[in-house]
């Protein structure tokens, strides 16, 4: 097969779409595809060499995408590589228009997709061009200023592209060199660098290259990940990178040392609620890991000699299992369900790769690490429990069903039986229908695994019949969802099973296995099943007849639910009949025929369902069925229409309608079988098409449509699960062997219906007989020669439309001359013709053209004479649509069928073996879809004059009087616009005519229609926004000018809304249009390689030299033209804006359009600059806002480039960098830090200083070339008025004009929305640009204003001055020393004034101002500012509030400087330390936050040296010594501090309490922000916190107690390193001996959270587990009742999440405690039941009972083997004294509650004697009184 094909093609295809080989015309496709490929290669190569990106290259790359959809990768490997290289060159053209880049990128992704087709030897692509492209778009320096407009989708397209590329082996090192210097954890560059690593680092390399691959970075990244404790945003990216690495290199990466840490972090990432009162750090929710990658990582680590991961995975599932129980719900549930659903799928994918996939160049998994059968079994076992629980989850059963489908593929014998155990009872129950829905949907997914049985699960098939029979009651008219799932269930099972009675084989054959004999005898029930199913359906139909269900008025449509039931019913019935043997079919046919012919149904609901069932029958075996139905119906109809008057009646007899309906459905069968009945059918059509009654003739039209369609279309006729059906005798063929058998793609034996000559003749005979006369009548009517009533016209149109629908596939498409001159191109833009199995007969009448001609005449006649005949217009619009596009199928039907095909495929696929092992019916469906797709692929059709006429008619309809007509016509118009090449350019001017202000004859309806035409629909073309200068230059000015049209009225809300939508859509969809269309030489060279390639040889060779020169000239001319068009568009919009009569709305729209036209590669024309600068002082706020953004962008355009030079850091520091990686503060980067003794304070120091502005350089490692700004002498001079360009002069003139500035500042200091305003970054950019470009030229004018604003404490004035100051400081980056010094001399006093006027509303703005001013600036340049802020933040002058604000502002500045100001941080800390005992809460909170930032730099990251900034450890030591009085004292700590500072110094203790309050604020603030937690230091504070934290939740507690509780909650969730755990446990043990029971109680709550959030890390050390266990068991015997109960709860939790195991030693320990003897009560103490102080014995006995109770409650959803005995032990204590009795009762009541649901299966675990006792206990009422 392959050989012959290679001979025809001349090459071996890379990978083609196999379904093409099964089409009825498959033998023609190789020639066709080679033709098209040669055409694509020739034209694409030529277009690239002629440098014609648009339309040439774009047109032919689109054709290439279409080729991929039609034939797959059907080209040679050489061509494949050439295409990829060419597209790679095109994608990475610098300055390429973004929409072109995206369209090339999507195609490139498609070409790179199947990794296995091209190895690294075949193809390597450089990574840098792609990185430059990605960087320029995702981190664009100009996008935020509005100089570039990118679509939202671009990010994902580029990411996918990067992931698909293959890079050379040297790339890893180059990437590390490029991005390592960005790894500064305090900076945003960290996120960027890790993001790049995740995206770009290659992980598929052969093992011998691993040293040049992941081994270069693995340890470094892994250590970084392990050492970060507080989940920064980039941690997720690292996880994604590790997951990809693991998946691509199974067996080559040793994960073992990290496994406990990995699983601990995965568990933390679910954010599950633990314990009683938990505070969640918000960052944990936003930055948690992506489940898809977690799943990939886990599934790649499983297996291997130790299989460590499986042990951890067991632990993971047992620790979260109970969260899956349906009674639990929360926002974490979605994540857990996703884990459940995806993990089995991921393992199946891995097994497929290891065992079944064809080997290719990618390194296979080494056999030591492949999953063994035991590994798979262990995996399935570990997932079974959670999945079975999740079946009934609140989120629905879909996730569980998908999980079970995959688990059943691997181990059917483990998962199917337990699901069956739940399914059978669910089928019996009447009260819980949701159980049925859930179990059936799970069974559907497992159907194939159940049926195929196999050696592991041979008893599977035996369940089929019992399941099918029991499912029948689910067909229930009263419960819709039950009905649907039952249909789906029955259909799924019957598709897989031939319904043939094989019982007779028991006598004939003696070689059957036991199982086969059982199935043979069971199959005798099939007939019974089919008949019972039919009875159920009949009952369903009877209960849904129309009369019962609704009023007369709503009769038109079935309700949505009814139509779904109809669909379910008909498809299930049709599946059943397809799978029946002939014997069973005949019985069923008889039954359905009798039902249909002995009753008369109304045609809307019941009638449709019955007719569907009859259609299903006749489709399966047409000959047998038609023999019954056709004569019956024809006789009935002939008989009923015998009377003359019938044809004129308005209402027809029900029986007549029903027979017509029945006939119209049963004729939807194989056309060949219809031919014997053709005379009868034609006779009926002649009788009924002219009936007066609309319902009557509509049914007749359906009959006409179906008869034509059955004979004219190409379609498969059988969908049986086995080719050839089941009619062979049992001796030679035993159907039970085919249960669950997949279709064999290579022997599908599809039976196609291809129209024979006889059928074709019949089709045209019908058209001549029935269509011709209608066309003639309509034509005479349209010419005014014959009167017709509207109803008659409509009836004729109905017949015409149904003829088109029926015979459309045989009528050749409309043809004629092409419309030329729309787009100049040097490349051939022809359409590709696809063969779809029909050879059009040119000798016959071309009805498509005839209909077209008549319809156009009729349309014009109706629009002239009776425009209100909307029904006829609707019909004509439908017909026009079909004339243009219909070749036998509709696009929307195709789309929904493709969707449902994918769904069915998913629900029944076998991902384990792969190889397209779908069932036969599905494969046939897919082949048919391939055929339909070929019919519908119409993009890039030539635009012919016929189409032009039809489009103009549609436009006329789209702007007609009635809105419904307009909207229907518009939808057809939009589809057409997307179909024909360049037709938009022809239509747009016609649409715009309606908006022309000079025209007075335009009605409001036409105006609105035209606007809708511009707007487009949500999926089609939007004429207002075609990415092309010609179109935009026409439409935008026209939209603005339409504001002057007489038809425009702003009083009509609908018109106002239309303009809003239009402007909004343009803004949303606009992408920067290219101006530069240069094609680089590399691409031209590759174009030449494509035209010179062979197999297939391109249609045309390399262009001649003169053509190439002409191409270059045209391309240069095109660039110039683009610039001119751009300038003209700007000019036109400005002209519109000059018009004084333009309404304000249109002025705003125009300014909006203008602001979209700012670009970073071409300066805005001067008049527009003038306009925007003037608009800064416009009256309307909207305009001012747009102007501010625009002027900021213009200033960026005018920014002059600064010269940069490389420097060598080692020369400056005089230190050579060490060989090994050393990050952090080291001698080599000390010169970057702030040293107050060596600041540049004079001109020469300043000039000699090497300033490094970006904060991250030098922290982690140095870049290959460190670029810094060249000395001032080499930089461009300041702007002088005589050297300015026109644009620069305009800005200069305005900003040196005092009146302009006056007005501007007045506007800027107005408030916009009260209380909502914030520091505005746009305004900041404006001022930054002014001071950057013009140095200090505008200061003299602005100074007086700034001084005035700073003195005014109003919110908006303060904000305004803050924005100016931030812009000024950042803008002064390159000023000379003299100017900078003068600037600070002015600013420092100004800022002092302003900061003393700070208010609640403005402190955030001042913080932003200073933070913005310090961002990415060398601290040594800002030393004036930093020193001013450091002066005295807590002077106390302005009261506590001003102090807090000063701190906030200072913090903003220092935080931006990160690690470069250790000296300032030390100074600040020593300044703050004595003030930590501050009284005021707001100052305390602020100090807490500032401390977090001071210690932020003290991180424990790998390869990082200890910081020079303050260390937490030393600070904590000092604090602890001050807190001594509290730690040592034993009495309760009360918050009894007097808030005013009393006279004299208070005692140490009061001071310590005040200090503690601040320290708590600091601990709370740092929990979510710092990277690493100083555990050893925090531990020393724990005893103190435990002492204070209250036990109950009560908001009335004072701040101190609440904070202490919060701190404990946050600390207990912290991630611990293994070496820290023993330290924590030691402290907890110590506190457990404390005298305060509150502290002992809190130890337990702390322990619960800490253990769960560090589960696997603690489990990996046996010693720690024993420590925890000892602690809990010790506290079980605490003297305080509350502590004992909490200990029991804790123990139960630890047992439940499998942290501790229930072993015999624990059981005997508790049983022994229970037997503690209690002292006898004395008789005379009857009054006092108990001594108030519990005796030691009572406590011990209670501890034992609590222990047993904890064990019982730790298994809420099942009954382990040890449980019955413990329940017996417990019951012995029912009559003990309190509190024991209470505990026992509570336990029993809980046990009853949690085990009640599944008591039937739990009962099995107990012996009869135990059950007697238990029933007594659980039922006797007194215990629950």
UniProtKB/Swiss-Prot annotation:
Compartments, record wording: Cytoplasm, Cytosol; Nucleus; Nucleus speckle
Broad class of the protein's primary localization: cytoplasm
Molecular function per GO: lysine-acetylated histone binding; peptidase activator activity; proteasome binding
Signal sequence coordinates: none
Identification of the protein by name: Proteasome activator complex subunit 4B
Upper taxonomic lineage: Eukaryota, Metazoa, Chordata, Craniata, Vertebrata
Gene Ontology terms: biological process: DNA damage response; DNA repair; proteasomal ubiquitin-independent protein catabolic process; sperm DNA condensation
Gene label: psme4b
Stated role: Associated component of the proteasome that specifically recognizes acetylated histones and promotes ATP- and ubiquitin-independent degradation of core histones during DNA damage response. Recognizes and binds acetylated histones via its bromodomain-like (BRDL) region and activates the proteasome by opening the gated channel for substrate entry. Binds to the core proteasome via its C-terminus, which occupies the same binding sites as the proteasomal ATPases, opening the closed structure of the proteasome via an active gating mechanism.
HEAT repeats: 458-502, 981-1020, 1162-1200, 1336-1374, 1618-1656, 1662-1700
Domain-related comment: The bromodomain-like (BRDL) region specifically recognizes and binds acetylated histones.
GO annotations of cellular component type: cytosol; nuclear speck; nucleus; spermatoproteasome complex
Annotated stretches, region: Bromodomain-like (BRDL): 1632-1720
Key words of the record: Cytoplasm, DNA damage, DNA repair, Nucleus, Proteasome, Repeat
Short name of one Pfam family: HEAT_PSME4
Keyword Cytoplasm annotated: yes
PANTHER family reported in the protein's UniProt record: PROTEASOME ACTIVATOR COMPLEX SUBUNIT 4
Quaternary organization: Homodimer. Interacts with the 20S and 26S proteasomes.
Family from the record: Belongs to the BLM10 family.
């Amino acid at each position: 097969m392959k050989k012959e094909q290679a001979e025809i093609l001349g090459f071996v295809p890379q990978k083609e779409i196999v379904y093409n080989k099964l089409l009825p015309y498959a033998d023609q496709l190789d020639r066709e595809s080679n033709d098209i490929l040669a055409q694509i290669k020739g034209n694409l190569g030529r277009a690239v060499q002629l440098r014609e990106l648009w339309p040439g290259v774009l047109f032919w790359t689109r054709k290439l995408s279409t080729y991929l959809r039609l034939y797959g990768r059907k080209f040679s490997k050489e061509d494949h590589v050439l295409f990829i290289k060419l597209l790679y060159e095109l994608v990475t053209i610098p300055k390429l228009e973004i929409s072109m880049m995206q369209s090339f990128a999507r195609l490139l992704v498609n070409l790179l997709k199947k990794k296995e087709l091209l190895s690294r030897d075949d193809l390597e692509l450089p990574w840098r061009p792609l990185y430059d492209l990605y960087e320029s778009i995702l981190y664009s320096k100009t996008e935020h200023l509005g100089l570039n407009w990118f679509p939202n989708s671009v990010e994902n397209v580029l990411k996918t592209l990067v992931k698909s590329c293959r890079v050379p082996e040297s790339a890893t090192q180059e990437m590390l060199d490029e991005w390592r210097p960005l790894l500064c954890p305090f900076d945003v560059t960290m996120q960027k660098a890790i993001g790049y690593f995740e995206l770009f680092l290659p992980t598929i390399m052969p093992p011998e290259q691993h040293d040049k691959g992941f081994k270069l970075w693995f340890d470094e990244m892994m250590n970084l990940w392990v050492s970060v404790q507080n989940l920064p945003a980039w941690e997720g990216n690292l996880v994604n990178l590790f997951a990809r690495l693991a998946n691509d290199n199974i067996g080559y990466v040793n994960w073992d040392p990290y496994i406990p840490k990995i699983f601990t972090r995965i568990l933390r990432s679910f954010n599950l609620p633990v314990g009683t009162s938990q505070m969640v750090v918000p960052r944990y929710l936003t930055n948690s890991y992506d489940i898809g990658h977690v799943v990939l990582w886990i599934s790649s680590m499983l297996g291997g000699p130790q299989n460590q991961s499986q042990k951890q995975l067991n632990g993971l599932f047992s620790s979260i299992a109970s969260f899956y129980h349906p009674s639990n719900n929360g926002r974490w549930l979605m994540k857990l369900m996703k884990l459940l659903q995806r993990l089995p799928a991921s393992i199946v994918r891995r097994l497929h790769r290891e065992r079944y996939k064809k080997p290719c160049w990618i390194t296979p998994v080494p056999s030591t690490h492949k999953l063994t059968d035991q590994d798979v079994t262990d995996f399935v076992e570990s997932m079974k429990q959670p999945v079975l629980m999740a079946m009934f989850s609140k989120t629905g059963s879909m996730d569980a069903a998908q999980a079970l489908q995959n688990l059943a593929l691997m181990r059917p014998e483990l998962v199917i039986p337990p699901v069956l155990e739940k399914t059978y009872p669910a089928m019996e129950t009447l009260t819980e229908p949701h159980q049925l829905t859930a179990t059936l949907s799970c069974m559907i997914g497992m159907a194939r695994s159940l049926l195929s049985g196999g050696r592991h699960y041979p008893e599977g098939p035996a369940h089929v019949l019992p399941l099918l029979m029991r499912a029948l009651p689910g067909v229930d008219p009263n419960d819709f969802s039950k009905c649907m799932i039952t249909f789906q269930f029955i259909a799924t099972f019957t598709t897989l099973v031939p319904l043939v009675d094989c019982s007779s084989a028991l006598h004939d054959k003696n070689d059957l296995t036991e199982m086969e004999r059982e199935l043979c005898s069971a199959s005798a029930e099939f007939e019974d099943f089919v008949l019972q199913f039919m009875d159920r359906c009949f009952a369903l139909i009877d209960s849904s007849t129309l009369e019962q269900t609704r009023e007369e008025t709503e009769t038109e449509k079935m309700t949505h639910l009814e139509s779904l039931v109809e669909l379910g019913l008909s498809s299930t019935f049709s599946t059943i009949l397809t799978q029946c043997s002939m014997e069973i079919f005949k019985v069923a046919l008889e039954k359905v025929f009798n039902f249909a012919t002995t009753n008369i149904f109304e045609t809307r609901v019941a009638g449709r369902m019955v007719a569907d069932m009859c259609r299903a029958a006749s489709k399966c075996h047409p000959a047998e069925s038609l023999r019954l139905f056709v004569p019956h119906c024809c006789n009935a109809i002939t008989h009923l229409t015998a009377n003359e008057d019938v044809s004129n009646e308005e209402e027809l007899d029900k029986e007549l309608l029903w027979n017509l309906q029945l006939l119209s459905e049963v004729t939807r069968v194989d056309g060949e079988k219809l031919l014997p009945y053709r005379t009868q059918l034609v006779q009926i059509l002649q009788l009924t098409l002219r009936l007066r009654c609309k319902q009557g003739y509509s049914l007749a039209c359906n009959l006409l449509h179906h008869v034509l369609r059955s004979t004219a279309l190409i379609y498969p006729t059988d969908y049986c699960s086995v080719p050839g059906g089941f009619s062979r005798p049992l001796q030679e063929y035993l159907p039970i062997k085919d249960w669950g058998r997949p279709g064999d793609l290579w022997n599908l034996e599809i039976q196609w219906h291809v129209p024979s000559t006889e059928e074709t003749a019949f089709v045209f005979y019908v058209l001549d007989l029935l269509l011709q006369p209608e066309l003639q009548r309509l034509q005479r009517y349209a010419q005014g020669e014959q009167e017709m009533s509207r109803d008659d016209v409509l009836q004729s149109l109905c017949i015409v439309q149904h003829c088109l629908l029926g015979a459309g596939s045989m009528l050749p498409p409309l043809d004629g001359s092409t419309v030329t001159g729309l787009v100049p191109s040097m490349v051939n833009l022809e359409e590709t013709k696809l063969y779809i199995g029909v050879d059009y007969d040119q000798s016959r009448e071309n009805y498509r053209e005839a209909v077209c001609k008549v319809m156009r005449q009729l349309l014009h006649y109706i629009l002239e004479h009776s425009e209100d005949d909307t029904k006829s217009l609707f019909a004509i619009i439908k017909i026009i649509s079909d004339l243009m596009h219909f070749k036998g199928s509709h696009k929307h039907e195709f789309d929904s069928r493709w969707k449902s095909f994918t769904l069915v495929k998913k629900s029944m696929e076998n991902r384990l073996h792969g190889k397209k092992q779908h069932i036969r019916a599905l494969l046939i469906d897919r082949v048919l879809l391939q055929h339909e797709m070929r019919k519908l692929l119409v993009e890039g059709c030539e635009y012919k004059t016929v189409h032009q006429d039809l489009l103009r008619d549609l436009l006329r309809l789209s702007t007609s009087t009635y809105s419904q007509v307009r909207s229907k016509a518009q939808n057809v118009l939009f589809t057409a616009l997307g179909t024909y090449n360049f037709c938009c350019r022809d239509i747009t001017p016609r649409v715009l005519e309606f908006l022309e202000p000079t025209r007075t004859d335009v009605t409001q309806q036409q105006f609105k229609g035209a606007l809708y035409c511009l707007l487009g629909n949500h999926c089609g073309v939007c004429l207002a926004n075609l990415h092309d200068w010609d179109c935009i230059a026409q439409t935008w000015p026209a939209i603005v000018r339409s504001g002057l049209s007489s038809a425009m009225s702003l009083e009509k809300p609908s018109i106002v809304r239309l303009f809003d939508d239009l402007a909004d859509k343009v803004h949303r969809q606009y992408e920067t249009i290219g101006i530069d269309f240069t094609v680089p030489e590399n691409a031209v060279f590759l174009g030449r390689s494509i035209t010179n390639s062979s197999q297939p040889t391109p249609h045309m060779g390399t262009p001649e030299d003169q053509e190439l020169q002409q191409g270059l000239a045209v391309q240069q001319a095109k660039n110039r033209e683009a610039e001119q068009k751009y300038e003209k568009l700007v000019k036109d919009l400005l002209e519109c804006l000059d018009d004084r009569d333009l309404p304000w709305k249109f002025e705003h729209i125009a300014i909006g359009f203008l602001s979209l036209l700012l670009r970073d590669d071409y300066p805005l024309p001067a008049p527009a600059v003038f306009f925007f600068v003037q608009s800064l002082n416009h009256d309307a706020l909207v305009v001012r806002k747009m102007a501010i953004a625009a002027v900021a962008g213009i200033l960026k355009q005018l920014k002059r480039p600064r010269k940069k030079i490389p420097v060598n850091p080692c020369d400056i520091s005089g230190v050579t960098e060490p060989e090994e990686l050393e990050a952090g503060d080291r001698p080599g980067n000390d010169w970057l830090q702030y040293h107050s003794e060596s600041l540049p304070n004079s001109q020469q120091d300043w000039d000699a200083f090497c300033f490094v502005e970006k904060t991250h350089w030098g922290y982690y490692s140095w870049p290959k070339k460190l670029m810094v700004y060249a000395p001032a002498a080499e930089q461009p001079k300041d702007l002088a008025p005589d050297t300015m360009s026109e644009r620069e002069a305009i800005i200069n003139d305005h900003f040196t004009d005092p009146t302009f500035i006056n007005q501007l500042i007045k506007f800027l200091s107005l408030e916009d929305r009260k209380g909502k305003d914030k520091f505005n970054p746009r305004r900041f950019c404006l001022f930054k640009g002014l001071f950057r470009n013009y140095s200090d030229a505008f200061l003299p004018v602005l100074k007086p204003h700034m001084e005035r604003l700073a003195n005014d404490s109003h919110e908006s004035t303060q904000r305004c001055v803050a924005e100016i100051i931030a812009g000024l400081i950042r803008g002064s980056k390159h000023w000379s020393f003299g100017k900078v010094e003068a600037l600070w001399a002015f600013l420092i006093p100004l800022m002092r004034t302003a900061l003393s006027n700070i208010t609640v509303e403005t402190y955030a703005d001042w913080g932003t101002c200073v933070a913005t001013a310090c961002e990415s600036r060398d601290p040594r340049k800002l030393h004036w500012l930093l020193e001013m802020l450091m002066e005295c933040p807590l002077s106390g002058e302005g009261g506590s509030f001003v102090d807090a604000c000063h701190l906030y502002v200072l913090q903003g500045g220092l935080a931006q400087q990160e690690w470069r100001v250790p000296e300032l941080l030390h100074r600040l800390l020593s300044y703050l330390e004595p003030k930590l005992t501050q009284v005021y809460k707001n100052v305390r909170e602020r100090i807490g936050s500032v401390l977090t930032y001071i210690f932020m730099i003290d991180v424990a990251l790998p390869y990082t040296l200890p910081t020079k900034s303050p260390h937490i450890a030393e600070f904590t030591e000092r604090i602890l010594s001050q807190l001594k009085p509290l730690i040592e004292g034993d009495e309760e700590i009360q918050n009894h501090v007097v808030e005013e500072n009393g006279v004299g110094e208070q005692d140490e203790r009061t001071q310590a309490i005040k200090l503690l309050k601040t320290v708590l604020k600091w601990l709370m603030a740092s929990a979510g922000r710092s990277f690493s937690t100083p555990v050893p230091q925090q531990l020393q504070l724990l005893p103190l916190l435990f002492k204070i934290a209250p036990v109950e939740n009560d908001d009335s507690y004072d701040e101190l107690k609440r904070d202490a509780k919060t701190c404990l909650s946050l600390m207990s969730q912290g991630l611990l390193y293994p070496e820290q755990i023993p330290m924590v446990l030691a402290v907890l043990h110590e506190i457990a001996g404390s005298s305060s029971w509150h502290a002992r109680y809190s130890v337990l709550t702390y322990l619960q959270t800490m253990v769960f959030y560090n589960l696997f890390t603690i489990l990996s050390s046996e010693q720690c587990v024993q420590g925890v266990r000892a602690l809990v068991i010790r506290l079980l015997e605490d003297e305080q009742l509350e502590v004992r109960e909490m200990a029991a709860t804790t123990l139960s939790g630890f047992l439940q999440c499998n942290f501790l195991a229930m072993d015999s030693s624990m059981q005997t320990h508790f049983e022994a405690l229970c037997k503690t003897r209690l002292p006898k009560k004395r008789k005379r103490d009857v009054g006092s039941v108990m001594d108030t102080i519990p005796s030691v014995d009572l406590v011990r006995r209670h501890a034992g009972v609590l222990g047993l109770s904890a064990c019982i409650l730790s298994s809420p959803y099942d009954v382990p083997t040890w449980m019955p005995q413990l329940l017996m032990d417990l019951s012995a204590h029912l009559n003990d004294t309190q509190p024991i009795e209470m505990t026992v009762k509570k336990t029993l009541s809980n046990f009853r509650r949690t085990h009640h649901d599944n008591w039937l299966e739990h009962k099995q675990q107990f012996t009869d004697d135990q059950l007697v006792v238990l029933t007594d206990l659980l039922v006797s009422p007194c215990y629950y009184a």
